[in-house]
Amino acid sequence: MLLQDVHHREQLDDDVENAFSKINGTARQASPFADEPSIDVPSTHLPVVTPRSKTANDRTGLAKSLPYASLGASRSTIDEQDVLIQTWAILLHQYAVSDTVAFAIIGKSDPSGYSGRRASTQVVCLPHLFLDSARATPHAPAVHGWDGRLTYAELDQLSNSVARQLLRRGVRKGQFVPFSFEKSIWMVVAIIGILRAGGVVASIDPSQPQSRAREIIQETGATVIVASTAQASVFAGLVDTVVPIADDTVHPAANDTGLHPSLPPVHPEDPAVVIFTSGSTGKPKGIVIQHGAVTTRMVAEGRAFQYHGARTLQFAASTWDIFMTDIFTTLAFNGCVCIPSEEDRRFNLARFCAEYDVSLALITPSLANLLEPTGFPTLKTLIFGGEALKEEVTRKWEAVDGISLHQGYGPAETGPCVAGRLAERPEILGYALDNSVCVLVDPSNPNRLVPLGAVGELVVGGPSLLREYINDPRKTEAAVIENPPWALDLMTPVRRFYRTGDLLRYSVDTLDGRLEFVGRTDDQVKYHGQRIELGEIEHHLSRLPGVEACVVVLAKAGFFKDRLVAVVQAGKSSGGSSYGTQLSLRSDPNITITHMRRFLSSRLPEFMIPNELLVVQELPHNNSMKLDRGRVAKWVADMQSQPSEAVPKPHTRGNELLAHESTARTIAREYARIVAGDSVARRREYEDRDFNLQEGGIDSIQIMSLSMFLTEHFGFQVPMADILSSRATVRSIASLIDANSSPGRGQPLNTQETARLPLRSNGPAPSQQALERNGSRVFLTGASGFLGIEILRQLLARPKTHVYALVRGSSESQARERLVQKAISAGWWQDAYRTRLHVWHGDLTQPQLGLSQLQWQMLQGKASPSIDAIIHNGAKVHYSQDYETLKKTNVSPTVELLKAVHDREEPLHSFVFVSGGQQLSFDDREDEKNAAKSLKGSGYARSKAVSEQIVRRFANQKGSKARHVRIVKPGFIIGDAERGLANQSDFIWRLIAACVELGFYNGDEADSWLFISDITRVAQVILHSVFEDDSQPVTKVLDGLRFKTLWALLQDKFGFELQPLSRREWLARLKHSVATKKEKHVLLREQFPALHHGVVPFNNAAGTVVHREAAESTHRYMTSFPYELGRDDPASAAKTQRLQDRFAELAAFMNADPDEIAFGQSTTFLLRSLGQALKPLLNSDCEIIVSILCHEGSAAAWVALAKDLGIAIKWWAPPPGDDPVLSLDTLRPLLTPKTRLVACNHVSNVVGTIHPIRQVADLVHRIPGAVLVVDGVAWAPHRPIDVKALDVDFYCFSWYKVFGPHVAQLYGRRSAQKRALAGISHFFLSEMPGLDWRLRLGANSFELEEALVPITRYLKRVGWDNIIAQETVLQDVFLAYLRRRPRVFRIFGEQSSDPAKRVPVITFEVIGHSSTVVANKVNQRGRFRVVSGNCWAPRPTHDVLGLGADGLIRVSFVHYNTVAEVQEFCTELDSVLETLNAGI
């Protein structure tokens, strides 16, 4: 029956009116249909609305409903029958009043809109989504953050590097990898890197308490954590490996170069991410989601919300599922992720979005309500999600034209499943997305559907569902429905559904299939977008001492509306039944909000800690004797004013503000308006009072609102560190504002009071007594730091001085070893120092620094031997943490030490405090102003300034217990000229690196003075303050130079091209520079004396210049007394031990063990010796494969061995061409079961090409008994050697190619030695262990081996990433020069500068000219040294490349060469060719 005739309207109107009059009447009796026969509900089918006249713009009507019989009409409840009547009535009314709506009764032929519904699925992985975009738009911006920007190509390179770094550090496919980052572009690099390595991302928010982080680590079983450099130290003791990711730890040049296996294949069914949310059992629950599920979510959301090419605001915390949307949906649709700093995110969001052209944002309604829509001129799409939308929010944003407004819904277990544009009522969410099948079921019986229009629990099916709850199969089973009976009725192939716990219904307002949110089935709530299980809060709160029972509610109305309220019962109940108990308040001084918040802050994230606390006599129970949550929630919601017996807040005890404190009063009133809303009673608690902002109950969203008001009202933005400080009060914030608006007014109270408090107990001291001039026992803090290790060196260099160093560690022995290792790395440690170095295991943050009673008494001069002098150098340098956080490391230990000095009976000789964080000035009159700036500066600057004030006051008080109290104030500190070791993370080096990379510097400040000194000089000043009477109370280290001198130095001496720019233009370029810094230590070349003779070595592949410490070490050895090894006397024992230590360090250089390395005079010698030792493995029936690209020193060893045994060599040749590369495809046909040895080089010394050694090893080791021997001579100067990652059997290289003398090193896998190697040394040495003894022919060149350890330490200090970066630039410049002249030069090998494919060994010939003649002309001019001929590799030169006797020209760089030298060489080469072409 189809109703279309307009003449039926009058009758239908009467029916509608009758129906509505009954619907709106009194409550029905037991049988709702008995008295109302006029309402004829069809017994077989439910109605379906369709358009009367369909136009192109009309949307298809409400999805057709099920046959009523399938719902079990006979089992309909009274409520369901009410719903059916109401639905019919509304449909009739819609038909009656609308020209476009009709309805029909349909049969079973097409019963449901679900028929055959197949959810959209993506069968790709997250990295693939990103890589597809990277291939399509490599140069488009992918990430634009406050700290830099990255294109898709750069993000691809960097994340690839991170992935390979993680593989080297032990990450394996499917392994959970916790991830903790502040907002940064490196956050995106890291998360993609984890996924590309096959890891599963498990985010830990930096703000979460350590206990929660520990729970997540325990749940995931993680052994590796990826973190920002700021967070790395937090996790140091929680897992085996912490991998910091930042601009100075990641470089695209660190791509796969054969050091390790390729990236593992990742499949859609593999886990991608685990999201931890609040759990009702008291610990977070982890939702594991597969790659295919996440990618399906991202694509569905991107299509629904117009993500194509969007510049997306990344606002969500990394622990939210929205975080993945912000990043991967944006990258999948070729957009750009825009990342604000934490301060901009909280307090300057509008400005950031405008400056970064943000066009799309997904935020919570609570946040959107704070923002002013007109402040977002670039915004085109705004999506509300995370919590219920309110009408005032929609009205606010709908008033602005040009912004498309959407609402999204979906728990973390399903991802986005419902979405749509805003409806008239915010409860209407939208339509099911194409990745989801959404069904409403009976909450008490999920196997039963609810009728159309009835409220039901939403269950979601499709490919986007979670895989499981980690380690909790029971919870997974309870949450997921498998093969529900109604799935067949719906005729959908989806068989797995998730129970959301959310109550929804089809909207009867719109009648078009949209879903409407109603409520929850449990006590889970959403609070400012965060999903909270109230049971988890209750679990922890119940453990607060004195709490017998508790209920936590989110108040829906009343005085506490929208607040988390904890209702607790203190003490035992009365003992009787509490069913029907009336709730009544009581006071308990032992349970306060302060106690509660402090207790929970170490257990829960900040957003889960209740704002309010109510203590009651007894909590009620229901008739099942369970806590009656409903009654408690209603009781709280019914409160219309502050209960008289409520727990008093700390702020109510605050002082009243005075009438003249206008700024403070304004702050307090705005605070009251934000927190108390319309409640007059609550406002009175805050207005005109001074109180602690955090303890007043303000939450994270409200603090943003307060900050915006302060900025707008006072024209001054209070720094985030100040407003979020745990000690921030109304008065302290007012003081900051007043100080900014009226210079000269008092500084913030909190820091001034801190400076005064520690000294109040310091009374008068006895008169001073003279002490010995040179204090012989010095206590030193911060000994293991960059400056501290140099102070320690100079102290130990004084033969009568004993040093007592405070060092953190798991034990005293570990602390000692840590400090000694630092000294070894610095290159100055001597074992003789052990008797005068006393390492005290302690911690600056602990009372009395964590020292034992005896040690503390030595500081107090009450135990023998007593400490004579204290150098307080220890502090935590962290520019983003607030003062309160840094106080415990930077202020409290100063107080502790001064208390110890104050308690002395005999005065201390010297107390020296090393300050920092302040601007220096030649004019002492500026010092007070600079100190005042520091007190308003960063948390670090403030903490150092407060400590300095404390020391000054201590020094000025009468009867001081220290003869000398002195302060040393250095500027920037660099490494000394002798060792060239720098703190490369320091600001000054980052500034220089940035300018070098840009090619520009700030010309406006070129005449400004740069206060900079080397560590030797600063340490000397400190020691002078300790030991000399004539030292000043305050010594400013004013050494330095003008910035223009620095820029000139970098240009003239180191070859960097730098040009001045205005400050504004320079800053603009700096902000848009690439994130990967090519940081290099500018004093590095000083380590190589041969570089200062005016000749530039571009013949490095034939032998590098020698590192100074290597030469000096050999000289020291040869001028020392020649004690024999292995004797019983102390001198021999010490020399033997040093030899063993050296072996261990040189083995570690290759990632080998000491018994796996041997030394010889050259690689040729060692490989010949190895060949002799391998003879027992071989016979004439065996086969040897040798690469034709080998250096003859390598190839000749195997040719000779094959000749001796009558074996025919198989030559492994590359495909023909000028770019010869060893291929696995050409190796496979050569391998047979008879293969016993394969030899090749890691890098061709002729063309510089890198060969895939790990893949070669995998192929060779498939043959039982076969060994792989690799010549690494051309690899070793350019890349780290990791024989375990390469999985080779033998590996050899020459140290004279690695900045050392003529000595070579060979690795032999222990198992290969035992299986294949016979000893060739003297018969009486046959039982000696290790490779060196097996191959030793006479004594080693110990004097040359002595030179090697300093080289390994030097390379470690410089860092391989920096070496690769520098060499990549060098080869890029020269290859570009050659490529631009294809008619002049014929290039051999890889023509790109890709560091994954080549090292900077570059060969070419000049077309039409003899290579020998060209090279001779260059060398004769005396400035450059290059090589020509066959480079001791005739087979690749003549047989492969087809060159004649003249061969080729080889130019080879290493990291000490400069760009300027390469450019000069290009000019020189042009000049040489001009003379040759002219016939001169």
Swiss-Prot record:
* Entry GO MF terms: ligase activity
Q: Which residues carry this modification: O-(pantetheine 4'-phosphoryl)serine?
A: S700
Query: What region holds the Carrier domain?
Result: 662-741
Provide this UniProt record's keywords sorted from A to Z: Ligase, Phosphopantetheine, Phosphoprotein
Matching entries from PROSITE patterns are given as:
AMP_BINDING, CARRIER
Q: Where is this region: NAD-binding domain?
A: 780-1003
Description of what induces expression: Expression is positively regulated by the fumisoquins biosynthesis specific transcription factor fsqA.
Q: Which domain of life is it from?
A: Eukaryota
Enzyme class (EC, first level): ligase
Q: Provide the domain comment.
A: FsqF lacks the condensation domain that is essential for canonical peptide bond formation, and bioinformatic analysis of the vicinity of fsqF did not reveal any genes that could code for a second NRPS or free-standing condensation domain.
Q: Output this protein's name.
A: Nonribosomal peptide synthetase-like enzyme fsqF
Q: Which organism is it from?
A: Aspergillus fumigatus (strain ATCC MYA-4609 / CBS 101355 / FGSC A1100 / Af293) (Neosartorya fumigata)
